[in-house]
Design a protein with these regions (language model features):
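A short acidic, glycine-rich active-site loop
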Residues: 1-2, 37-39, 107-113
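Histidine/acidic residue-rich metal-binding segments in metalloenzymes
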Residues: 1-17
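Amphipathic, soluble alpha/beta structural segments
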Residues: 27-37, 134-145
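His/Asp/Glu-enriched, well-ordered alpha-helical/loop segment
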Residues: 12-86
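C-terminal cap of metal-dependent C-N hydrolases
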Residues: 80-143
Length: 145
């Protein structure tokens, strides 16, 4: 808990937020040589929006640390017609059975969160909307090219 408290107390010196998404199954994690990481992509923004709703920081801080700063640090070019829409007031419980990840579990099972991604537009095309993935496999693109 001391480490967690220290992180919250020092948010002002953290340049950016990043997340791992290593969708290993529980069977893989329970092996002699478990792979590192855990599924985190689907829960990152709802967890951060929850923290913002609790007054730990602002939505502008999230934008700065998840979009603006990483873009600057890693020299990521502008992505035309690309954005994420959220419902900051949506409240729900994180449940692995409702997630898209192949691993079937989350370390945040049962956590109550406030804030849900409702739409993702990538290069002008809806790729996620109202809980449904609309993009076909392979629609992603190397943004460094």
């Amino acid at each position: 808990q001391a480490d967690i408290d220290t992180l919250w107390e020092n948010m002002d010196v953290i340049d950016c937020f990043a997340t791992d998404h290593a969708p290993h199954t529980l069977e893989e994690k329970d092996s002699q040589k478990p792979p590192p990481g855990f599924p985190g992509l689907e829960t990152a923004l709802p967890l951060l929006l929850t923290a913002a709703s609790e007054g730990r920081f602002t939505v502008d801080d999230i934008i700065e640390k998840m979009y603006t700063a990483p873009k600057k640090i890693f020299h990521i070019p502008d992505q035309a017609e690309t954005w994420v829409e959220v419902d900051e007031n949506a409240q729900y419980e994180i449940r692995a059975e409702e997630m898209y990840s192949r691993c079937g579990w989350t370390p945040f099972e049962g956590w109550q969160v406030k804030g849900r991604v409702t739409r993702v537009v990538l290069r002008g095309k809806d790729v996620y909307k109202d809980g449904e993935v609309l993009a076909e496999k392979g629609y992603g693109k190397d943004i460094r090219a």
